[in-house]
């Protein structure tokens, strides 16, 4: 196989790996935790993974001391937890 063909194959495999969703067996355990507002009194939009709906949802975060199922962006939540 030529070097161009190998590069194309490598590129396709990399793309496939990036687009393959997280399976439930590979999902971190903290993705199962309920949303946690934290102990501070702020009003920041954050996202958490909801396992019963199998998707990331917004919630209001107080700004500190929450559990790890707390993401600044929807994309970060999906990349980490969504299948």
UniProtKB/Swiss-Prot annotation:
Tissue expression profile of the protein: Expressed by the venom gland.
Record-level Gene Ontology MF annotations: serine-type endopeptidase inhibitor activity
UniProt-listed InterPro entries: Kunitz_BPTI, Kunitz_BPTI_sf, Prtase_inh_Kunz-CS, TFPI/VKTCI-like
Disulfide bonds: 31-81, 40-64, 56-77
Keywords: Disulfide bond, Protease inhibitor, Secreted, Serine protease inhibitor, Signal
Alphabetical list of Pfam families matching this protein: Kunitz_BPTI
Function: Serine protease inhibitor.
Protein name in the entry: Kunitz-type serine protease inhibitor vestiginin-1
Organism: Demansia vestigiata (Lesser black whip snake)
């Amino acid at each position: 196989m030529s070097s161009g063909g190998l590069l194309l194959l490598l590129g396709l495999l990399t793309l496939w790996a990036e687009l393959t969703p997280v399976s439930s067996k590979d999902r971190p355990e903290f993705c199962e935790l309920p949303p946690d507002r934290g102990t501070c009194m702020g009003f920041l939009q954050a996202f958490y993974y909801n396992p019963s709906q199998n998707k990331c949802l917004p919630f209001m975060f107080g700004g500190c001391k929450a559990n790890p199922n707390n993401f600044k962006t929807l994309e970060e939540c999906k990349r980490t937890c969504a299948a």
